[in-house]
């Protein structure tokens, strides 16, 4: 994510624009010169500049410092303070996303461990653990490829759903069972086409319901 200082407000902002992999952060030396979260991590020493990414990609700390200095000049602070500001803002943004899938869904993040994955996830995981009071913070082996690993090893599955705009007592047992059977056939169809035998299918059912007047399941 790219950090910038709007001319109108002079308040530090981070994202949603991204430098992507190309040109990428200034430190990647691929033509990028805009300050990014990655550059801020390098300036702060959270991402060491004396190692090579992937074993052969050199990190240019000087380029990262030059890029982040633009932010420092824009808001009238020092280089390190500007880098810290970038990281604090992006951490708060990620914390907001964590709240969407925890607190706002009725789950207390204090009851869960936090797993930091993705290429840069471990750089921010401890800070997010503190913000959300989620412990322990777990960094898996190969966090950058965890999603790909999960996709390659997960069980094949499909699902089907149906909505009822009615009170529970108005839905007859016969109709309900018939609809469950229909949903089972729909969810199983794609798996059978993919070569999964009917005997290996495992069917589970779930109902999301709400009280009268409730706005969410």
Q: Where are the predicted features?
A:
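N-terminally biased helix-coil "hinge/interface" segments that flank
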Residues: 1-217
């Amino acid at each position: 994510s790219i950090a910038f200082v709007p001319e109108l407000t002079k308040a530090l902002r981070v994202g949603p624009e991204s430098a992507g992999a190309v040109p990428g952060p200034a430190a990647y030396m691929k033509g990028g010169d805009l300050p990014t979260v990655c550059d801020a991590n390098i300036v702060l020493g959270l991402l060491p500049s004396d190692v090579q990414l992937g074993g052969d990609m050199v990190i240019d700390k000087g380029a990262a410092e030059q890029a982040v200095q633009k932010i420092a000049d824009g808001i009238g602070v020092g280089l390190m303070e500007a880098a810290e500001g970038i990281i604090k803002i992006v951490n708060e943004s990620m914390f907001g996303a964590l709240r969407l899938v925890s607190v706002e869904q009725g789950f207390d993040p204090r009851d869960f461990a936090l797993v930091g994955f993705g290429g840069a996830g471990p750089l921010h995981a401890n800070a997010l653990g503190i913000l959300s009071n989620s412990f322990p913070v777990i960094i898996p082996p190969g966090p950058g490829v965890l999603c790909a690993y999960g996709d390659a090893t997960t069980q094949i599955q499909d699902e089907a759903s149906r909505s009822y705009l009615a009170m529970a007592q108005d839905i007859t047992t016969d109709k309900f069972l018939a609809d469950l059977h229909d949903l089972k056939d729909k969810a199983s169809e794609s798996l059978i086409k993919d070569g999964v035998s009917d005997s290996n299918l495992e069917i589970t059912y779930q109902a999301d319901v709400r009280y009268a007047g409730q706005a969410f399941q």
